[in-house]
UniProtKB/Swiss-Prot annotation:
GO terms for cellular component: cytosolic large ribosomal subunit. The keyword Hydrolase does not apply. One of its GO terms (biological process) is translation. Keywords: Ribonucleoprotein, Ribosomal protein. Pfam families: Ribosomal_L14. The gene is RPL23. Belongs to the universal ribosomal protein uL14 family. InterPro entries: Ribosomal_uL14 (IPR000218), Ribosomal_uL14_CS (IPR019972), Ribosomal_uL14_sf (IPR036853). This is Large ribosomal subunit protein uL14. One of its GO terms (molecular function) is large ribosomal subunit rRNA binding. Coiled coil: none annotated. The lineage of its organism: Eukaryota, Viridiplantae, Streptophyta, Embryophyta, Bryophyta. It comes from the Eukaryota.
């Protein structure tokens, strides 16, 4: 694995449908005090003129659009834990959630908050063990 890659993640991630392009506003699923996160960049850049997009388990750079004033107007990393866009798992099941959500992390992928509201995707739990330990349901 290269030196510059996923901070606290372990293992590989299969190809999945990218459901959250740059400019997407997602719910914040942790107890930091942020309500909405605005995705400003993603690691994946695809075809010419296509917006970079992210999926469950991807780390993105985001800002807080609604929430505590001390969290707003700062760029911070976040990990996507739920997406509405259906994706296909290796066992043939098509999976999707009822909302788009992410959690705020530090650059290494460790969480400061202690709780995550709602379920998280198995792809995210496999890659980010600190997020998986704080989740109450892994789907």
């Amino acid at each position: 694995m290269s030196k510059r890659g996923r901070g606290g993640s372990s293992g590989n991630k299969f190809r999945m449908s990218l459901g959250l392009p740059v400019g997407a506003v997602v719910n914040c699923a942790d107890n930091t005090g942020a309500k909405n996160l605005y995705v400003i960049s993603s690691g994946v850049r695809g075809r010419l003129n296509r917006l970079p997009a992210a999926a469950v388990g991807d780390m993105v750079m985001a800002t807080v659009k609604k929430g505590k004033p001390d969290l707003r107007k700062k760029v911070m990393p976040a990990v996507i834990v739920r997406q509405r866009k259906p994706w296909r798992r290796k066992d043939g099941v098509f999976m999707y959630f009822e909302d788009n959500a992410g959690v705020i992390v530090n650059p290494k992928g460790e969480m400061n908050p202690s709780a995550i509201t709602g379920p998280i995707g198995k792809e995210c739990a496999d890659l980010w063990p600190r997020i998986a330990s704080a989740a109450n349901a892994i789907v």
